[in-house]
Regions:
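Terminal low-complexity/charged segments
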Residues: 1-165
């Protein structure tokens, strides 16, 4: 049986509960778009009241003017999926961690933190997962400029740009 998308009628009921949330009623596969402030409560309702017991994956998209978090949730009993999105400020992208409800989010949130610079509040171990601990940038951001590695006193340091001389 093919997985179905969460119905527009049920999405409309969620928007009644969370009036700042929206969805595209014309879309074939509508996503629930929420504020970062509402995200923890929305996620809790989706898990506890709507049966979304599995987080398939999460990722982030840099749209230059904002960072968009994208979560793919599944209700395994009803064979239903839902995409939840939240726009974050590019200058300081912050959102509550999903790990309290979905422990499997731990490593994916670390990856998004490392590569996109999103801070996940309440994350149990928020640190880099791919880049060196002292790496000064987030390489999947559209404003990324590769720092230049340099050895100083036997230690690797990162320069914001290449030295001119």
């Amino acid at each position: 049986m093919r997985t179905q998308y969460f119905s527009k009628e049920r999405l409309a009921k969620l928007v009644e509960i969370f009036p700042r949330a929206t969805f595209d009623a014309e879309a074939e596969e509508p996503a629930l778009i929420v504020t970062a402030a509402d995200f923890p409560a929305v996620l809790r309702v989706l898990k506890e009241k709507e049966g979304f017991d599995r987080l398939g994956n999460l990722t982030a998209v840099d749209w230059k003017d904002h960072i968009e978090m994208v979560y793919h949730l599944y209700n395994m009993e009803e064979n239903v999926k839902l995409e939840v999105k939240a726009a974050l400020d590019s200058a300081a992208p912050v959102i509550e961690s999903a790990t309290a409800l979905y422990p499997g989010a731990e490593f994916e949130e670390r990856e998004v933190y490392d590569l996109m610079g999103v801070e996940f509040l309440g994350h149990p171990d928020l640190r880099r997962i791919l880049m060196p601990d002292d790496y000064p940038a987030h390489p999947l951001r559209k404003d990324f400029v590769a720092p230049v590695p340099k050895m100083e006193g036997g230690k690797l340091v990162w320069l914001k740009k290449a030295p001119t001389s």
